[in-house]
Amino acid sequence: MITEDEVNKLLSENEALFRFMGAKFEKIERGVAKLSFEYKEELSRIGGMLHGAIIFAAMDYSGSYAVRTLDVKEAYTLEFNVIFLKAMKTPPFTFLARVVRETKRYAYVEVEGFDGNNELCAKGNGIWHLIRD
C-alpha cells in the first residue's frame, strides 16, 4: 500500500492545487485517509473563512485516497455532496475520509471536515467508480 509520504510527494510534484493548498496526508490505511492543512488568505473567501471550493477539494482528495487503498488500479469520483455546517476559520483544517461500502465496481465514502477546535464543520459523501486489474 502507498504511504503518506509517497502520496504527499506524488501530489506535491504533480498537482498544483494540492501544492497551493499546502495539504498533507497524515494517515492512509485501508479504507481511511486523513488530510490537513493550515490557513492561507488565498484559500479564504470574504469574511476570512475557508472557501467552499477548497473544502470540496480537500474532501475529494481525502475520499480519493481512502478509495485508492482498496487494491484498485484507478478510481474516479462519480458523485460527491457536501453539507457546510459551520464556517471553517480556525486552523488547522482536517478532513477524515472513510470507505463505508465497497463493491466490485463502486465505493461509497463519507468525509468529515474539522476546524482547529475539532468541531465538525462540513460533512460529505460520495461514490467512486473503481477500476480493478
Curated annotation (Swiss-Prot):
InterPro entries: ACOT13, HotDog_dom_sf, PAAI_dom, Thioestr_dom. It comes from the Archaea. GO terms for molecular function: fatty acyl-CoA hydrolase activity. Its EC number is 3.1.2.-. Keywords: Hydrolase. The keyword Hydrolase applies. Pfam families: 4HBT (PF03061). NCBIfam families: unchar_dom_1 (TIGR00369). Belongs to the thioesterase PaaI family. This is Putative esterase STK_17900.
